[in-house]
């Protein structure tokens, strides 16, 4: 009940800068300093590493050490530049997942952060289906998504994702800026066939469309934490 009330309150704030203190799910990226709001987190998406394509395909760690998080559910995030993974990358990912869990973290899933082109979602779904088969049975699989998917995504590709991933977090920002006209994309969220969350930028603009809270696939928000601007 408390989570539902918080969700409704957050959705009701029009045109306000995103106040992280009103939310309970956060991304914490490399180079971003921890903030007091993390103490209220129920779900954390922590960047573990990045799969680079050059000079060779490899998983490069982005954290100095294995995290130790008490209480909050953890999603291990991997930023991906290529889907052509070598067997070594899969082994590295699974080994890191095991280390995070062995350290006492409640790791619920792996999130893949990849800028899949809107017209090639079917290919992305095939990669994700293969990855899912390699993950432990109790490990969920999530992805980040582009707002364009809701408006122009191939219906067959969206349906393929629905059979593979547990959630998509649709980001209304690129880099450190909110996408202009994001409301137009959100108006078409009825096309989404996968449970989804909305990714917000700390301090960025946000106005929830009236229909969002009633969407049966809407699961809440994730706030991308950012370092305060230097003065």
Sequence positions of predicted segments:
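Sec-dependent N-terminal signal peptides
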Residues: 2-11
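Secreted glycan hydrolases and related glycan-binding modules that recognize and/or cleave
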Residues: 11-231
């Amino acid at each position: 009940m408390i989570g539902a009330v918080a969700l409704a309150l957050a959705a009701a704030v029009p045109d306000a800068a995103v106040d992280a203190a009103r939310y309970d799910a956060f991304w914490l990226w490399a180079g971003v300093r921890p903030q007091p709001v993390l103490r209220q987190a129920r779900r954390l998406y922590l960047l573990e590493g990045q799969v680079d394509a050059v000079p060779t395909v490899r998983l490069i760690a982005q954290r100095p050490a294995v995290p130790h998080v008490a209480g909050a559910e953890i999603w291990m995030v991997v930023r991906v530049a290529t889907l052509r993974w070598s067997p070594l990358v899969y082994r590295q990912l699974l080994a890191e997942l095991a280390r995070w869990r062995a350290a006492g973290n409640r790791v619920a899933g792996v999130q893949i952060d990849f800028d899949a082109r809107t017209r090639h979602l079917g290919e992305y779904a095939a990669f994700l289906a293969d990855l899912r088969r390699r993950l432990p049975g109790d490990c969920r699989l999530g992805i980040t998504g582009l707002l364009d998917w809701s408006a122009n995504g191939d219906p067959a590709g969206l349906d393929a994702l629905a059979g593979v991933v547990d959630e998509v977090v649709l980001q209304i920002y690129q880099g450190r800026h909110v996408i202009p006209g994001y409301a137009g994309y959100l108006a078409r969220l009825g096309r989404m066939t996968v449970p989804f969350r909305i990714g917000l930028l700390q301090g960025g603009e946000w106005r929830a469309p009236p229909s969002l809270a009633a969407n049966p696939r809407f699961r809440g928000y994730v706030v991308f934490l950012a370092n305060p601007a230097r003065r």
